[in-house]
Regions:
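Conserved Radical SAM active-site core
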Residues: 8-9, 16-17, 21-24, 40-41, ...
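Short secondary-structure boundary/capping segments within folded domains
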Residues: 32-36, 45, 234
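Short hydrophobic segments within beta-strands
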Residues: 26-29, 91, 183, 216
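Conserved AdoMet/S-adenosylmethionine-binding subsite of the radical SAM
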Residues: 97-258
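Haloarchaeal acidic low-complexity proteome signature biased toward cell-envelope/secretome components but also
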Residues: 1-31, 243, 253-258
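Residue-level detector of flexible, active-site-proximal loop/helix-junction positions
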Residues: 30, 60, 250
């Protein structure tokens, strides 16, 4: 169910109900990344994000946020229309910027769904989350003036200041079954990854195992992934981390609703 009416910077529609969420798209597909890659899942993609990665694969949830305000009941009805689905993935954008995401997750859990939340790890919420799929954004994600899709570098400083919150990351790791999924652009990212993991481990009570850490090649098309997948796979083997594909890109390239 694609929805694409402009929501103008993600300000709430004055007519939207109190439990409404801005939804960019809602669809049934295969989980493409992480520990649950290949699992049939319903994806709920919220619109709006507190960061601006230059390589964002959901441009119309961040740089130009679009969507329609749907109530939790409306979202649940759409999820239940996919009768074979047992897994639901709440993604974005950054879904946890919306307080109503917690209510939606709790409802989904009450109905027996396994819930995964795809988050950049800058916000903690107390909710029914079965798997916190945390993707901390590295320095290589920062939209410098040379890489900014908008061409002006306006978000560079704000993104850089906000992209890592070690306290939020440690709370997520301590509260939920989690995976730490890093988007890797090259070998230079590994030093930052190792340093960040040390910082989280120094605060979190939960031990982070090496197989909780996943390296994923940056790329939103098959051609872009082809340029990096071998290097990232070799880095995963070299450091003892997991390699995760982007299965949906391999299967459907950059088609929406996949």
């Amino acid at each position: 169910m694609p929805v694409a009416s402009d929501v103008g910077g993600m300000e709430r529609d004055t007519e939207a109900e109190s439990d409404a969420l801005p939804i960019n798209e809602l669809f049934y597909s295969l989980q493409g990344e992480g520990k649950l890659a290949g699992v049939p899942s319903v994806f709920i993609r919220t619109s709006g994000c507190n960061l601006r990665c230059w390589f964002c694969d959901s441009y119309h949830t961040s740089w130009e946020p679009q969507g329609s305000w749907l109530t939790v009941d409306d979202i649940i009805d759409e999820v239940q229309s996919h009768e074979d689905a047992e897994h639901v993935v709440l993604t974005g954008g950054e879904p946890l910027i919306h307080e109503e995401s917690a209510g939606l997750l709790n409802r989904l859990s009450e109905l027996g769904y396994h819930t995964t939340v795809e988050t950049n790890g800058t916000i903690y919420r107390d909710a029914a989350i079965d798997l916190a799929s945390i993707s901390p954004k590295l320095e290589s994600s920062t939209p410098t003036s040379e890489r900014d899709p908008a061409g002006d570098g306006e978000w560079e400083e704000r993104h850089e200041e906000s992209r890592i919150d070690v306290d939020a990351l440690s709370r997520l790791v301590d509260s939920y079954d989690s995976q730490l999924k890093f988007i890797v652009t090259g070998r230079d990212d590994l030093t930052e990854i190792e340093t960040l993991l040390d910082r989280i481990r120094s605060i979190a009570e939960t031990e982070i195992q090496r197989d909780d850490v996943l390296l994923m090649p940056e790329g939103t098309t098959r051609e872009q992934l082809d340029e990096r997948r071998q290097e990232v796979a070799e880095l995963a083997m070299e450091h003892g981390y997991r390699y995760t594909p982007r299965l949906h890109v391999d299967l459907w390239n950059d088609a929406p609703g996949t």
